[in-house]
Structure formats: structure tokens, C-alpha cells
Amino acid sequence: MAALLNDAEIEERLGDLTGWTRQGNEIRKTFQLPSFPSAIAFVVNVAFLAEAAGHHPDIDIRWRKVTLSLSTHDAGGLTGKDFDLAAQIDEII
């Protein structure tokens, strides 16, 4: 099981990301895409990253907006896995 990050580690890792915010025991970001089909294509690409990482975000799709939430549920909070996947997601947008 991945180790939980403390508040200082979380803030440091958040500083390395753009647009991600902490919401309790998760980090979240909303992506604005040019169209609904491009939003779906983005989610498909996120799914491939998530499968490769063995770590899956919660996904909310609202027309052209996709909100991703990351938390390591089996650890009960935020771990390095969440921030690593967030960084990978940011690379594909």
C-alpha cells in the first residue's frame, strides 16, 4: 500500500501541478475541452493512463467539461500515486 502524504508533502506536490486543488482527501481539476467528442476522447486517454498506473480517477463529464478527482482509497487519502497520475494527465491535455 502506498504511504499517505502529510499536509506539507501534499502542498509541495500541489505546487508542481497547474490547476489541481485539494478537496479534503482528494485532488481535483476541471478540464475545458473544445467539444463533447473531444471531452470523451480525453477521458479515453485518461483511462489508458489509469489502467497502466493501476490507479483510477473519479470522472465527471458535463458536456465539454471533465472533472477528475484523485485519491488513493485503499490508503484513505492522498499518496504519491495521485500526484504522479495527475502529472501524467496534464501531459496529455
From Swiss-Prot:
HAMAP family recorded: Pterin_4_alpha (MF_00434)
EC number(s) stated in the UniProt entry for this protein: 4.2.1.96
GO BP term (any one): tetrahydrobiopterin biosynthetic process
Pfam families: Pterin_4a
Descriptive protein name: Putative pterin-4-alpha-carbinolamine dehydratase
Keyword Ubl conjugation in record: no
InterPro entries recorded: PCD_sf, Pterin_deHydtase
Species of the source: Roseiflexus castenholzii (strain DSM 13941 / HLO8)
Protein family according to the UniProt entry: Belongs to the pterin-4-alpha-carbinolamine dehydratase family.
Single annotated GO MF: 4-alpha-hydroxytetrahydrobiopterin dehydratase activity
Catalytic activity: (4aS,6R)-4a-hydroxy-L-erythro-5,6,7,8-tetrahydrobiopterin = (6R)-L-erythro-6,7-dihydrobiopterin + H2O
Lineage top rank: taxon: Bacteria
The keyword Lyase is assigned to this record: yes
Keyword line: Lyase
SUPFAM superfamilies per UniProt: PCD-like
